[in-house]
Amino acid sequence: MNVRGRVAPRRVTGRAMSTLLAYLALTKPRVIELLLVTAIPAMLLADRGAIHPLLMLNTLVGGMMAAAGANTLNCVADADIDKVMKRTARRPLAREAVPTRNALALGLTLTVISFFWLWCATNLLAGVLALVTVAFYVFVYTLWLKRRTSQNVVWGGAAGCMPVMIGWSAITGTIAWPALAMFAIIFFWTPPHTWALAMRYKQDYQVAGVPMLPAVATERQVTKQILIYTWLTVAATLVLALATSWLYGAVALVAGGWFLTMAHQLYAGVRAGEPVRPLRLFLQSNNYLAVVFCALAVDSVIALPTLH
C-alpha cells in the first residue's frame, strides 16, 4: 500500500472522531457532571444511605439523558447567540460542525428516551419531572427569560435544581421537604455562580443582546446581589442539616463560611475600586457545591444520629 492509501483511512477516522466529539459537546458533559454531584447524594439521603445499585444506575442514566437532551436543545435555540459570543463561538452549531436538524433530532430523541427510561425503570413521577425540566429549560429559560430579563438565571435556574427532585422521587416515589431544601440550595447558588462568570464575559452578553445582570447593571449592584444569594445559599444548606447528622452540618457551616468570605471579598473589592476577579468566585463556587453535597452523601451512608 502506498503512502496515500495509508493516509486516507486516517483522515476518515479523524473526521469521524471530530464529528463524534462535536455531537458529544452538544450535550455539555461538564454540566452533566455537576448534576450528578447533586443527584447521587439526594438519592442516598432519600433512603438514609440504603444503596440500591440498579435503581440508582437507572436513575442516573435516565437523568443524564434528560440533561443531555436539554443541553442539546439549548444549543439549538442559542445558536444565533453563540455565534457572536467569543466564549461560545467554538460550540458545534456556532461553527456549523453539526447540522441543526441533526442536533434537534438528537435533543428530542434523548428527551423522549429519558422520560420512558425513568418511567419504566423507576416511576412515573421521576419521568414526568425530567420531562418538565427539559421543557422548562428550553422554552421558559432559553427562549423566553434569557433574552428578556436580567433575572433570567434566578428563575431559569430552577431547571438546574431538578436533578435532586428527580433523584429523590425515583427512590421514594414522593417529594418531601429535604428534597425541597436541596432544591433551594441549588436555586440560590445558581445566581452567584452564573453572575460571577458573566461578569468576566459581560461584553459578550452585551454584543449578543442578552440582558444578563452584569451586562446591564453596575459591578457594585451585581456583587451586592451575589452576596445576598450567597447568604441565602448558606442558610438553605443549614436548614437541610435538620435532616442529617452533625457531620453534614459541620461541613456545611465551615464551607458556608468559606463561600461567604469569597463573596464578601468580591463585594468589598468592587466598593474599594480594586481590580475585579470574579472567575475566582465562579470556580470556587463549583468546589463549594461539590463539598457540601459530597458531605451529604457521606453523612447519608454513615450511621450517625440526626440533628432533629
Swiss-Prot record:
The protein's annotated pathway: Porphyrin-containing compound metabolism; heme O biosynthesis; heme O from protoheme: step 1/1
UniProt entry tagged with the keyword Ion transport: no
Transmembrane segments: 20-40, 50-70, 102-122, 124-144, 149-169, 170-190, 227-249, 288-308
Documented EC number(s): 2.5.1.141
GO biological process, one term: heme biosynthetic process
GO MF annotations in UniProt: protoheme IX farnesyltransferase activity
Catalytically driven reaction(s): heme b + (2E,6E)-farnesyl diphosphate + H2O = Fe(II)-heme o + diphosphate
Cellular compartment(s): Cell membrane
Keywords: Cell membrane, Heme biosynthesis, Membrane, Transferase, Transmembrane, Transmembrane helix
Claim: Zinc is one of the keywords in the record: no
Predominant place of localization: membrane
Membrane topology reported for the UniProt record: Multi-pass membrane protein
UniProt GO cellular component terms: peptidoglycan-based cell wall; plasma membrane
The protein's role, per its UniProt record: Converts heme B (protoheme IX) to heme O by substitution of the vinyl group on carbon 2 of heme B porphyrin ring with a hydroxyethyl farnesyl side group.
Similarity comment: Belongs to the UbiA prenyltransferase family. Protoheme IX farnesyltransferase subfamily.
Further information: Carbon 2 of the heme B porphyrin ring is defined according to the Fischer nomenclature.
Protein name: Protoheme IX farnesyltransferase
Native source species: Mycobacterium tuberculosis (strain ATCC 25618 / H37Rv)
Gene name for this UniProt entry: ctaB
